[in-house]
Amino acid sequence: ILDSNQNISPQNLFIGQQIQIPGYVGLAYQIRRGESLWAIAQSRKISVEGILLANPNITPTSLQVGQTIKIPLRITWRVVTGKRNYDYNSLVIDIRRLQTVYPFLKISSIGNSVMGKELQEIVVGNGNKRVHFDGSFHANEWITTPIIMTFLDDYLLSLTNGNTIRGIQTTPLYEQTFLSIVPMVNPDGVDLVINGPPSDEPYRSNVIEWNKGSTNFSGWKANINGVDLNDQFPALWELERDRNPKSPGPRDYGGEAPLTQPEAIAMADLTRRRDFARVLPFHTQGQVI
């Protein structure tokens, strides 16, 4: 609750002040003829006190037909919808949903893709162990993004409902760990694989040319500039340059120099700034994550 209300002083709460309760949402409900708060609470399996807390300005004995109140609803199911073609827009929608239900999430932009899409970082927890997850460095491995988002969803459900994950209590993990997640490093590439070439030029003409005239991009790993982001880092970059393609294409071209692509620059800057103790990039090949 404290992490969901960082602008509020716990020692200086006042009557009527609104705070955010993680793991709950308020559903709008219209009063029907003959209904009482007790009857509504019974039908929804919640307490009258919970309804009153969500509606501090109502008078329980003077409810009006058609009056709208908020019904507090505890979230006990996944918010993320991962089993679909998970493009950038799907990610943005799911991040927004998670932030609504779990306001203790910290969402920020660490940079932009070539085509201007925000690269979003999600931070959970406030411990000293600095851990990082990321997915979709490679465009055709986009399934790693919904897997990470589903894992995050399960973690948040466990935290707010007091459940374990495979027998492990998660509250200590939250208290001990600073978890940073960039779920989609290569959004332009992911959208290319899932939705086909963009209408924007010169990107459309370039990617079709580099893909040998085909509009089937299911094997495309690179970003929209035809650069493999995983080969963009100044760590033995010259070895990758010498053994891989020398021009833009669907895979393995490391660029003209290290850190020329905005997505790689953003990830390198984030890693230096956060000083992670552990980094777990999610990849998939041969039906293995």
Residue spans of the language-model regions?
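Short glycine- and acidic-rich boundary segments immediately preceding or forming the N-terminal edge
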Residues: 50, 72-115
